[in-house]
């Protein structure tokens, strides 16, 4: 039955590249297109954030090439990775570029796709579940909740230079976005939280750090904007992590379904009769 389902999906052709999102960690969150590509690819160029269990779906004989990029650590240059995809495709391979999360959400998938266009290499984009949604769901934190917010902002915690992005209007986000989800923000969390507080956010606003989201190593720290930097240091947390700011963090007390599997008692009223401001 499952083979019949895969038989109806598009083929990964020789000389082409698929840019595929592997989701936030759990192999069960792979899409059918992603699993199908793993079954067909001759070469799989994968990121550091791709769960090794996902790679077990690769067909026998497939070549695995690591192209992981981690902030502050030695890693291949983006242009070199993009050109490697071109080289592999021109050699007649069926190439799978497998990226954690979604390739078009802070995954530099657009840059790689533009290089393929530049060199006239056929390609397909296969979206994945981004960690800023799926990873938070595994922590029991919804990015939207009708009583809390009508908008959410996704941002990166560092720019191409490795510094806090100076093109982000921190005051505007602080005043206008009830929920903020941040990727790659651990390194500069002190500066980022200071920017948000200076922009008008309450120092007591809840914040959650979800490290190694959707994996057996998942760890969640709940804190506040004012205590975030110190609490992260005290806990010894390391990237990768998703950071979420906003009242939705309080819902984890009721929606931590993984914790419930281990015996956590979930709260019936996670807001404990708190008066919430009108959703923005």
Curated annotation (Swiss-Prot):
**SUPFAM superfamilies per the UniProt record, alphabetical:** Tetrapyrrole methylase
The pathway is:
Cofactor biosynthesis; adenosylcobalamin biosynthesis; precorrin-2 from uroporphyrinogen III: step 1/1; Porphyrin-containing compound metabolism; siroheme biosynthesis; precorrin-2 from uroporphyrinogen III: step 1/1
The chemistry this enzyme catalyses reads:
uroporphyrinogen III + 2 S-adenosyl-L-methionine = precorrin-2 + 2 S-adenosyl-L-homocysteine + H(+); uroporphyrinogen III + S-adenosyl-L-methionine = precorrin-1 + S-adenosyl-L-homocysteine + H(+); precorrin-1 + S-adenosyl-L-methionine = precorrin-2 + S-adenosyl-L-homocysteine
What's any GO biological process attached to this entry?
Answer: methylation
Does the keyword field hold S-adenosyl-L-methionine? yes
Q: What happens upon changing residue 184 to A? A: Strongly reduces S-adenosyl-L-methionine binding. Causes drastic effects on enzyme activity
| Keywords carried by this UniProt record | Cobalamin biosynthesis, Methyltransferase, Porphyrin biosynthesis, S-adenosyl-L-methionine, Transferase
InterPro entries the UniProt entry points to: 4pyrrol_Mease, 4pyrrol_Methylase_sf, 4pyrrole_Mease_sub1, 4pyrrole_Mease_sub2, CobA/CysG_C, Siro_Cobalamin_biosynth, Uropor_MeTrfase_CS
What superkingdom heads the lineage?
Bacteria
Tell me the null mutant phenotype.
Cells lacking this gene are deficient in cobalamin biosynthesis.
Give this protein's Gene Ontology molecular function annotations: uroporphyrin-III C-methyltransferase activity
Q: Which residues bind S-adenosyl-L-homocysteine?
A: 24, 100-102, 130-131, 184, 213, 241
What regulation of activity is recorded for this protein? S-adenosylhomocysteine is an extremely powerful competitive inhibitor of the uroporphyrinogen III methylation. SUMT exhibits a substrate inhibition phenomenon at uroporphyrinogen III concentrations above 2 uM; this property might play a regulatory role in cobalamin biosynthesis. The enzyme activity is completely insensitive to feedback inhibition by cobalamin and corrinoid intermediates.
Q: Does the keyword Protein biosynthesis apply?
A: no
E.C. no: 2.1.1.107
Q: How does activity depend on pH?
A: Optimum pH is 7.7.
- Give, from the UniProt record, the effect of changing residue 49 to A: Reduces S-adenosyl-L-methionine binding by about 50%. Causes slow synthesis of precorrin-2 and accumulation of precorrin-1
Function statement: It is a step in the biosynthesis of both cobalamin (vitamin B12) and siroheme. Neither uroporphyrin III nor the chlorin (factor I) is a substrate of SUMT.
As a miscellaneous remark, the entry gives: Uroporphyrinogen III is a key intermediate because of its position at the branch point of two divergent pathways. One pathway leads to protoheme, and the other one is the cobalamin and siroheme pathway.
Classification via NCBIfam families: cobA_cysG_Cterm, PRK06136.1
Subunit field text:
Homodimer.
Q: Please give the family membership noted in the entry.
A: Belongs to the precorrin methyltransferase family.
Descriptive protein name = Uroporphyrinogen-III C-methyltransferase
Provide the gene name from the record: cobA
């Amino acid at each position: 039955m499952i083979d019949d389902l895969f038989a109806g999906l598009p083929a990964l052709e020789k000389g082409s590249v698929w840019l595929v999102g592997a989701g936030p960690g759990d192999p069960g969150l792979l899409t059918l297109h992603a699993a199908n590509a793993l079954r067909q690819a001759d070469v799989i160029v994968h990121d550091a954030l791709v769960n090794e269990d996902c790679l077990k779906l690769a067909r026998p004989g497939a070549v695995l090439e690591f192209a992981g990029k981690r902030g502050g650590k030695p890693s291949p240059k983006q242009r070199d990775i993009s050109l490697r995809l071109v080289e592999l495709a021109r050699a007649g391979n069926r190439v799978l570029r497998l990226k954690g999360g979604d390739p078009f959400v802070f995954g530099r998938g657009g840059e790689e796709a533009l290089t393929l266009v530049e060199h006239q290499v056929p390609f397909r984009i296969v979206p994945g579940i981004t960690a800023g949604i799926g990873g938070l769901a595994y922590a029991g934190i919804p990015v939207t909740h009708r009583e809390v917010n009508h908008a959410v902002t996704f941002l990166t915690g560092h720019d191409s230079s490795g510094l806090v992005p100076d093109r982000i209007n921190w005051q505007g986000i602080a005043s206008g976005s009830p929920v903020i989800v941040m990727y790659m923000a651990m390194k500069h969390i002190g500066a980022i939280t200071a920017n948000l507080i200076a922009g008008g956010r309450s120092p007591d606003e809840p914040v959650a750090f979800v490290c190694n989201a959707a994996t057996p190593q998942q760890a969640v720290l709940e804190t506040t904007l004012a205590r975030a930097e110190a609490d992260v240091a005290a806990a010894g947390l390391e990237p990768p992590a998703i950071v979420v700011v906003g009242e939705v963090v309080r819902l984890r007390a009721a929606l931590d379904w993984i914790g419930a599997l281990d015996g956590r008692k979930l709260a019936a009223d996670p807001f404990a009769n708190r008066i919430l401001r009108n959703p923005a």
